[in-house]
C-alpha cells in the first residue's frame, strides 16, 4: 500500500445521525462543521425530506451531496412520504422514524464499511440521543459511539430520573401522570410541573406512551456510548451536570463559525430573508422586539391575533418570523414580517431588545449568548424546562400568562414587553451577565472549548 493510501486509511471519519426535526438537525450540522474544520471527514445522514430542504437552501451548491468542509450529505426515507403532514407532529414523526429508519441506516453503514478498503474507516457514529436504535446499529458493527443531546442537560437528567419518578408515585410505569405537582430534582435545577413532562405534552395518548417507552429504551442504549455530549454550558446548568456527571457540555455549538465571513447557510431549511438585517440596521439599538416560534407551527389563530395586537400596542419596532405558519397581516409599518430569518445574525445585530420565543433550546442558547431578555410562550416538549431556566433560574425573562381560553391576551403581551424593555432594566443587566458566562465557556480555556478539544483528540486517536 502506498503512502497516499496509508493517509486515507488514517483519516478519521465520523458518521452523524440527527433526529429529523430542524431543532435537532441544526446543532448537529454545526457540530459537524466544527469537526470538519479539525480535519475529520463527516458523513451526515439525513431524511430525504430534510436533505432536499437543506440542499435547496444552499446558494450555488457545487454538488448535490458534497457541500465542502469535508461534509458529505446522504439521505434515507423517513416513511412519511404518503402523509407529509405528520412530519409536524412530534409523536407521529418519532413513531415513523422508529419503524423505517433503523434498517435503512444499518444497510447504509454496511455499504460504507464494505467500501472502506480504499478510503476511510468509520471512527465513530454520533447520533442524536433520542435515536437509541442508531447507537445499537453502531454497536452491532463494533463502531465507537457518541450520543449527542441537542437539549438542556436538565431534559436529559429528567429522562434518567424516570425510575425515581415511578418509585415516588408521580407517574405510572407507562408514563401516565398520577399526581399533578411541581417538582425539583435537586436544588438549583429548574422546577418542573408533572403535567408538562416532555412525553406528557403530546396530545395523543398513544403517542405519549410510545415516546415514553422510547425514552426508556434510549436510556439503556446511551449507557453503552463512549461519550454523552450536550449542547449546553456547564456554568448555566451546574446542578443538572451534577446529577448527570457523565454528560459532557460542549455548547453552544456553532458559536465559533456562525458569524464568520463567507460562512455558508448549511443547516438552513429554507432560504433566509436577509433584507431584514438591513431593516435592523436602521433601528435604534435595543429597540426591536424579535418574535420567532421555531419550526413546528403550534399557535392557533386566536393566539396569533392577540399577540399581533399586543405587539402593535407597544408602539415598538417588531421583527416577526412566521416559519411555515400563515402570514400575519398587521397594519403597522413598524412591524416587519418574514418567513425565515438568519436568527444568529438577527440576535447579534445589537438592535434586539426582547426575544418573544417558544423557548426551544437552540433559541434559548442563541438569545442567552447574545444577552437578550426573553418573553416566553412554551408549548410542548422541553420548552417548559427551558422557560423555567429563563424565568426562575437565570432570571433573564418573563413568562406570558394564558387566560381561561389558554390564550395570552393582548394586554398581557404589552404589559410584559414594557416591563422587559424598561430603560436600565434588570432583565437586560442579568442577560448580559449570562452572555459573559456563555462566552467564557467557549473561550480557549473554557469548559466547553476544552471538552471539544478532548473529543476531537479522542476521535483522531481511533485511527492512530
Swiss-Prot record:
- E.C. number: 2.4.1.-
Binding residue positions for UDP-alpha-D-glucose: 295, 341-343, 358-366, 380-383
Gene Ontology MF term list:
UDP-glycosyltransferase activity
Question: Per its UniProt entry, what is the enzyme's top EC class, as one word?
Answer: transferase
Superkingdom assignment:
Eukaryota
What CDD domains does the record tag this protein with?
Answer: GT1_Gtf-like
Q: Which InterPro entries match?
A: UDP_glucos_trans
Q: Which UniProt keywords apply?
A: Glycosyltransferase, Transferase
* Family membership noted in the UniProt record: Belongs to the UDP-glycosyltransferase family.
What is the name listed in the Swiss-Prot or TrEMBL entry for this protein? UDP-glycosyltransferase 83A1
* Gene of this entry: UGT83A1
